[in-house]
Amino acid sequence: MPASIQAAAYADTEIIFDWHKVEGFKGGSIDGIKVIVRGTDGAAQTMVGIDLLFATSHIPTPSDGNVSIIDVAPTTLGTTGAAVDTPGWFNNLVGYVPVAAGDFNDADLIYLNIANVNLAGEEIPVSGDLYVAAVAKGALDFRTTARVNETGFAAGAQTVITVDTKDITLGFAPGDVVHAVDDAVLGTIKTVDSATQITLTKANVDAIADSDIIYNVSPIQLILSGTV
């Protein structure tokens, strides 16, 4: 989810993320999904629904007896942060999972929300490469005020990054991939050292300017369970 798009709240019907290839799923079908959604500037969201779409790269050809499979990835839904406006993915679709606002827990976890979706009896078949995309059903807001507090530095310059304006521990954690609001890549967080400092796994990828607001580019996590 590009940092530059997260700089504004998502609205109903907007693409949260376009087709993302799922790596390492072992089952023959998906029978459950956990959806973890990070908060707004370190506080749990007022949750809205999220529509999850699943697609395959294997398109059957029943008119010729399925003697061949068309192996092609789904085409884009459109521009992230805007409504779906691009066709071509119709025959790749294999599943639709509406995750309602009421499926998520309340704000007891303070910093995020989580939902469990049981697909028993409505399992999503998996063959070929598996893809997932998401569309917002209301205002999802991943904006943050955490920003770099350094003299601007070149690509590959440092692993320790000082931040200010927001306690970084509230919205960021080890493993988060962090980009600046202009989509410049800092890198992956190794440790959150204090309220004002993070350490990356390796030196920053792109040049970074002082006061760049930073974003976790994967604020939504999906955990899929399946059966063989």
Predicted region positions:
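C-terminal interaction-tip segments
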Residues: M1-Y10, L119-A146, N216-V228
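Surface-exposed ligand/attachment interfaces on beta-rich extracellular proteins
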Residues: P2-E23, T40-V48, T61-N66, G78, ...
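Beta-rich globular "head" domains
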Residues: I16-A55, F172-G175
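Extracellular and analogous surface-interaction loops
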Residues: I16-G27, N118-I124, D164-I168
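Short, flexible beta-strand-to-coil junctions
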Residues: V35-D41, T56-P62, A133-F142, V181-D182
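Surface-exposed turn/loop modules enriched in turn-prone residues
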Residues: R38-N92
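Extended, solvent-exposed segments with strong compositional bias
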Residues: A73-E122
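Autoprocessing Asn-cyclization modules and mimics
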Residues: R143-N216
